[in-house]
């Protein structure tokens, strides 16, 4: 919990799997951050300047911005419900991705490989 921010840097993959309640947001500056729980990234906005991989089901409410890309993996159905402005595109590599708003998939291309 708390008001701090989580920052992911470095080329490696970091997986967050627990439910977290921090509110200061998440910054992904390098590598890949995998969220395997819709509550893994707390309640703040996500600045994705690398790769955010969502390997989970449920509804992801956090706003996603930045120049990075979003990958939906795993077999579950995930709904993006935030007003997202990320520009790096969206890749669906597994499961189903539902956009509940026009802005949910950011402004980049969408590639469906599922």
Show which residues each predicted segment covers.
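Surface-exposed loop/turn positions within long extracellular repeat scaffolds
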Residues: 1-2, 13-67, 79-114
